[in-house]
Amino acid sequence: RKVCDCYIAFSNLNNHPLHRIMGEGAFWRIPDKPLITTVFFDVDGTLADSQGKVPESYANALRYMAQSVSLYLATSLSMEQAKKKLGKALFDLFRGGVFADGGLLSYSRQIKCLPVKVYPEVYGESSKVTIHSYEGVVYKYSILVRDKEQRESILTRLKENPCQVFHKAPLITVIHPEASKKEGVLQLCKALGLASEHTLVVGNSLKDWPMMSVVSHSCAVMNAEPLLKERARYTLNPDRLAAFFRFSNGDPIDQTSSDNS
């Protein structure tokens, strides 16, 4: 159930920038800004576009928000992949986050991994395997298999083992069976004492909904999957968040942002 948290005002303004967000018509809404102290962002499709680039308007918004709110990532990417995609300057604005779909958590100068067992006997020597680890602990690995029959055989055998398997041809990704963005966000909120009513999670895919559903403020980006936009409390792009939320003053950035692979 959606809750109205704004004032309704009458306006005869034409071509106002808010019409792009609120829609055309005589009635438009002036929001009563909720207080937000922490924001979690997905990366692919949320901060980064289809070409893997972060729009400059989003980058500027992140720099602005980082001055007064705690920023965290919540992504299927490993930590080094997220750093490469965002670039060091933007990545360093974040205090940590949930990486590899919950396989690795980074916060308060700590890094915690959910180890996943590697099964070389399943995928063989002919497959291209990328292993992501921290201090020798493997928390995610990906297998590139272009042959469909071979890929299906590997998938079948992997699913017989205690691991979580994601498949988007030609790539197979393996993480700990209990890892998830939702559990990662919950663990960070508990460890850091983050209040749900002051936490915002921003995503673009229906797969992001479980982690978005555990906080009071969920936001889908404008080009998100329709089903996610139906469920999310807000539909806004990252560069519009400051117009609709009141951000608290945060402490200086304190994070661990390096990853061993």
Task: Tell me what each language-model feature is.
Residues 57, 81-84, 106, 153, ...:
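Phosphate- and divalent-cation-binding pockets in alpha/beta enzyme and binding domains
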Residues 120-214, 223, 229:
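Conserved acidic, metal-coordinating active-site core of Asp-based
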Residues 1-43, 64, 194:
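Non-catalytic pre-domain segments flanking phosphatase-related domains
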Residues 36, 68-69, 94, 101, ...:
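Short, well-ordered alpha-helix to beta-strand connector turns
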Residues 39-41, 98, 201:
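Residue-level marker for buried hydrophobic side chains located in beta-strands
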Residues 50-134:
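Active-site phosphate-binding/coordination module
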Residues 10, 29-35, 182-261:
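Mg2+-dependent phosphoryl-transfer enzymes with acidic/Ser/Thr/Gly-rich catalytic loops
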Residues 47-49, 208:
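Catalytic P-loop NTPase motifs of RecA-like helicase/translocase cores
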